Amino acid sequence: MPHLHLSLQSGNNLILKRMKRRHSREQAIDVCRNLKAARPELTFGADLIAGFPTESDTMFLDTIKLVDECDISWLHIFPYSGRPNTPASRMPQVNKHEISKRSKALRDLAQQKRMQHFAKLKEKTLSVLMESEFKGRAEDFTEITTSTPLKTGEIYALKVDSYNADSLIARD
């Protein structure tokens, strides 16, 4: 299935270093571009943390930009929550209101990216593995619903008629 989920966490190099991540922003972008060049149909998902200690507005904007630079369609957003007795707990904290605001901005971006992805798939026929009678997943991990019950565990060629905020809507 041409879907890859990346644990990026942030789009800012200093924040990544403070998180003790082993990759840089530039490495993430290079990996995504190289993979997309080799497999254009590949979609990316990513985990992102909003409000890690010391994250400034400019650092946060680096994360927003990274979503476009890596062509990420699926975002899993986590507001930072501290753990006692960790290195991050001893760093200057971002206030809770700002963490909430940044989390919302990332969730809004996630919805926008999802809608763009769905729009690209409208009117296409996709191979769908049914996970339940009315829901399945396309090869790129996109959820698809049907109005007709289909056999769980089977793969169907379904044409995408429309979409809503959460999934594609297909006919068989």
Where is each model-derived feature located?
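Conserved non-cysteine loop/helix-boundary elements of the Radical SAM core domain that shape
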Residues: 1-73, 84-98
